[in-house]
Amino acid sequence: VSLTRRQTAAALLALPLALTATPALAHGGGGPRGGGHRPRTLHLAGDSTAAQKYADAAPETGWGMALPFFLGPHLGVANHAVNGRSSKSFVDEGRLTALLDGVRPDDLVLIQFGHNDEKTEDPARGTDPWTTYQEYLRLYLKGARERRAHPVLITPVERRRFADDGTARPTHGQYPAAMRALAAEERVPVVDAQALSLARWQRLGPDGTEPLFNWLEPGESPNYPDGRQDNTHFRPAGAVEVARMTARALLEARALAPRDVRRLDAPVPEHLITWPRPA
């Protein structure tokens, strides 16, 4: 599968954030090879909730765009997440192969799918949580391990859904449970973004979560002249929120070491989020 110019441009964002630092190895394996120091990379496979967004979609923001703010300068992020993809279609389109081509020993491979796996009426994307979903996820784990990298499963972040009494509602069915079960079976770390985000949305409530999602008044953004009420995708504040909880969870799971993370409790100004021009 050949990559489009836009996908190639997104891949350029994978360049390490700095070129001089000793790799931090939370897993305790591997050291500098050949006398040199190589920064590690976090490779992200996922869907539109994590994907790089461009100027024609602003202010919609994938949480993968905000993840570098919480990582040390010796870590890079290769954001391969793409709108509309499931664990199945990402593989079938050759995107997993493209991601794995850039993976090196001791890198991390972050895997978050679920939103589009739920679309079981679409044969190109839909999976069954306890069979095909797990089977496809195993391909990501296998590919990472074959390259002596460290896979991490991430349950799908929750949508903004509230019951009439203000209770935040789960929306992903059995997919998070199936991923947690697979993580236990395969003995890989899992970031339970579904549970973490659901609890966070509950604390913030309907009004407090609205600024995190891509809700826009008519005329507020030239990209959405009629406004928008999107309870799935994020604005910068929401992307920062999810990236922060992900970085903290990676630390707690010992997928990252304390020296690998920063700003976990510090504000991140939204103006630091930028959207490249479409390729």
Language-model-derived ranges and their functions:
Residues H27-A81, T97-P105, V109:
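Serine-esterase "nucleophile elbow" of acetyl-processing enzymes
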Residues S86-G94:
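Structural motif
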Residues H80-G84, R125-G126:
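Short, basic, glycine/proline-bearing loop/turn elements
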Residues R95-V240, R244-R259, W275-P276:
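Alpha-helical cap/lid subdomain in secreted, periplasmic
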Residues V1-L15:
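N-terminal secretory signal peptides and thylakoid transit peptides that target proteins
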Residues E270-P278:
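Short, low-complexity, Pro/Ser/Thr/Gly-rich segments in the mature regions of secreted, periplasmic
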Residues A255-P269:
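Short, flexible loop/turn segments with low-complexity composition
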